[in-house]
């Protein structure tokens, strides 16, 4: 296809096309996820939600994007200008980089590396640097306090999340995401959610805490510290933080589907319904499972009040981490005993 180009471009262009094919849909999904969030929470609270721009409000995300693009990026006089502008980039770059190893189907992945799970844990943890930098560079006590809260929270829940994913690693016998999904073949009852149920719950709740979403959004608690680490941000600089948060939400949901719910595998494998749904592409099953987890994100926001900071820390260190360690021992024993059908 690119034979007429220099050899260096023949390698680079296909990779760039694949990156665009992942990043562009992600940005579009984020745009309409914000619309879905406002509508769903509106219905839960007996309201209509946005309904003015376009038919039934479906063009509201476009209006929001135009508004953010036209707004001025105001830099406080006492802020560190370079670091202030660098922080949003440092927040969104890791959130996008992680998607390089996410498989959407058996052979639909940008980089099929064997240490994909390790890569996700390493790169995913780097987004906290953007948050810390934003809090420090803003030269605001509210921003700095929000950044410190966020850093402590992310580090705390990353341990529990990492231990939960180690359980999947033991069960699947691989760090490759595709191989972990293939290890769950056999239908709904063969997926890892059943033997790893406590780790499944802890992973998802830790994911909600890591993305600073309600009820764990003390890092940007409006009633306590105005708006947290991005209190001084406006325009597209603010939009990048916003984009990073929602991309991480989608990432946590997609990983939950891959690690615990069989990824792109049909839930009807091994049943009489398997032949009926055989025509459904694997990526559709993955999108449905991801959408279910995203709905839980929105449901939590509409349902639960914000936890106190000390309650969040206690939950992470004194409840989640001990449970994950105990269950890892249980999973290790089940693996040694080759308990079927998950650990054979």
Curated annotation (Swiss-Prot):
UniProt keywords, alphabetically: Cell inner membrane, Cell membrane, Membrane, NAD, Quinone, Translocase, Transmembrane, Transmembrane helix, Ubiquinone
Organism encoding this protein: Nitrosococcus oceani (strain ATCC 19707 / BCRC 17464 / JCM 30415 / NCIMB 11848 / C-107)
Domain of life from the UniProt record: Bacteria
GO CC field: plasma membrane
Membrane-spanning intervals of the chain: 13-33, 82-102, 116-136, 161-181, 188-208, 240-260, 280-300, 319-339
Primary residence: membrane
Subcellular location: Cell inner membrane
GO MF annotation terms: NADH dehydrogenase activity; oxidoreductase activity, acting on NAD(P)H, quinone or similar compound as acceptor; quinone binding
Record field: catalytic activity: a quinone + NADH + 5 H(+)(in) = a quinol + NAD(+) + 4 H(+)(out)
Family: Belongs to the complex I subunit 1 family.
UniProt entry tagged with the keyword Transmembrane: yes
Protein name per UniProt: NADH-quinone oxidoreductase subunit H 2
EC number: 7.1.1.-
GO biological process: aerobic respiration
Binding partners and assembly: NDH-1 is composed of 14 different subunits. Subunits NuoA, H, J, K, L, M, N constitute the membrane sector of the complex.
Membrane topology annotation: Multi-pass membrane protein
HAMAP family in the record: NDH1_NuoH (MF_01350)
Tagged with keyword Acetylation: no
Stated role: NDH-1 shuttles electrons from NADH, via FMN and iron-sulfur (Fe-S) centers, to quinones in the respiratory chain. The immediate electron acceptor for the enzyme in this species is believed to be ubiquinone. Couples the redox reaction to proton translocation (for every two electrons transferred, four hydrogen ions are translocated across the cytoplasmic membrane), and thus conserves the redox energy in a proton gradient. This subunit may bind ubiquinone.
PANTHER family: NADH DEHYDROGENASE SUBUNIT 1 (PTHR11432), NADH-UBIQUINONE OXIDOREDUCTASE CHAIN 1 (PTHR11432:SF3)
Class in the EC hierarchy, top level: translocase
């Amino acid at each position: 296809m690119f034979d007429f180009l220099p050899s260096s471009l023949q390698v680079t262009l296909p990779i760039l096309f694949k990156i665009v094919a992942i990043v562009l849909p992600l940005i579009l999904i984020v745009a309409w996820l914000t619309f879905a969030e406002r509508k769903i929470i509106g219905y839960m609270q007996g309201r209509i939600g946005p309904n003015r721009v376009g038919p039934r409000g479906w063009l509201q995300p476009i209006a929001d994007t135009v508004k953010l693009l036209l707004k001025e990026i105001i830099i406080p006089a006492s802020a560190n200008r370079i670091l202030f502008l660098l922080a949003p980039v440092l927040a969104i770059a890791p959130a996008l980089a992680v998607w390089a190893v996410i498989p959407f189907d058996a052979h639909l992945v940008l980089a099929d590396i064997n240490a994909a799970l390790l890569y996700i844990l390493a790169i995913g943890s780097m987004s906290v640097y953007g948050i810390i930098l934003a809090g420090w560079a803003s030269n605001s006590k509210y921003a700095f306090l929000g950044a410190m809260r966020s850093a402590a929270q992310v580090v705390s829940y990353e341990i529990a999340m990492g231990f939960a994913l180690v359980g999947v690693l033991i069960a699947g016998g691989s760090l490759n995401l595709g191989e972990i999904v293939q290890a769950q073949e056999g239908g709904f009852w063969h997926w890892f959610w059943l033997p790893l149920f406590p780790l499944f719950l802890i992973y998802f709740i830790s994911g909600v805490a890591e993305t600073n979403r309600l009820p764990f959004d003390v890092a940007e608690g409006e009633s306590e510290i105005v708006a947290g680490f991005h209190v001084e941000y406006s325009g597209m600089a603010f939009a990048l933080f916003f984009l990073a948060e929602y991309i991480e939400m989608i990432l946590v949901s997609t990983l939950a589907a891959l690690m615990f719910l069989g990824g792109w595998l049909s839930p009807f494998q091994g049943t009489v319904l398997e032949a009926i749904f055989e025509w459904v592409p694997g990526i559709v099953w993955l999108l449905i499972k991801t959408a279910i987890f995203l709905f839980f994100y929105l449901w939590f926001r509409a349902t639960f009040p914000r936890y106190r900071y000390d309650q969040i820390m206690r939950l992470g260190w004194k409840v989640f981490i001990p449970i994950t360690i105990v269950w890892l021992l249980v999973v290790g024993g089940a693996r040694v005993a080759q308990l079927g059908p998950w650990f054979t």
